[in-house]
Design a protein with these regions (language model features):
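Short hydrophobic alpha-helical runs that function as membrane-insertion/retention elements
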Residues: 129-132
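Hydrophobic, mid-to-C-terminal alpha-helical segments
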Residues: 111-117, 127, 178-191
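Metal-dependent phosphate/diphosphate-handling catalytic cores characterized by acidic Asp/Glu clusters
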Residues: 1-98, 104-114, 135-175
Length: 191
């Protein structure tokens, strides 16, 4: 059996970027990377904001994305995100993605520098920016529902004392704890 070939990036010009589309080429996670000009209208794409590491220090790439029959080692922190897309039937929905660790050749210092200069444009032109906070925990749904609840009561015309009493009620302890867990995830402190 032949050793898989590592993916080799084609160079991009300073006014270009790569976008990624997941495709079905068999059992492994596969994709295509295509270069587009920033001077022309871009196809509709989503951008992903996420953390590169889980513990803050070590970049781990223990799985490969197949691109043009070549293997691209990909950050472990992306695998759960891709698995969620797949479980929701959204992995192969013909959507373009901009995911920095894949769309930028991380081995090319000059390209990284050029692409970093375009990040504001890349994120602002995305149809959606998805913030991947990490895998779902046992209290993630509680935290997200509590955020919606806080938004709702913030719009009501409560006097501050009544609002304080509502939010300090014992029934909210678990919800505050869940929200604290959500807000202590690495994504919030990565910059």
């Amino acid at each position: 059996m032949a050793t898989p070939t590592l993916y080799s990036y084609e160079p991009v010009k300073p006014h270009q970027l790569r976008l990624l589309k997941f495709v079905d080429y068999g059992t492994s996670v596969s994709a295509i990377l295509k270069t587009f000009s920033l001077r022309q209208p871009l196809p509709t794409y989503d951008s992903l904001s996420y953390t590169w590491t889980t513990n803050g220090d070590v970049l781990s790439k223990s799985w490969n994305l197949v691109i043009d029959k070549q293997q691209l080692p990909v950050l472990d922190t992306l695998r759960p995100f891709i698995d969620v897309l797949e479980s929701k039937g959204q992995l192969l929905d013909d959507r373009w993605w901009w995911i920095d660790s894949i769309c930028i050749n991380q081995s090319d210092v000059e390209e990284k520098s050029q692409q970093i200069q375009h990040m504001q444009h890349i994120y602002s032109q995305a149809s959606r920016v998805i913030c991947w906070l990490g895998e779902e925990s046992s209290d993630s749904n509680i935290a997200m529902e509590f955020v919606k609840h806080l938004d709702k009561i913030s719009r009501d015309k409560y006097h501050i004392d009544k609002l304080r009493a509502i939010l300090q009620a014992g029934e909210y302890r678990a919800k505050w704890a869940a929200l604290g867990n959500l807000l202590s995830r690495r994504w919030w402190s990565r910059i």
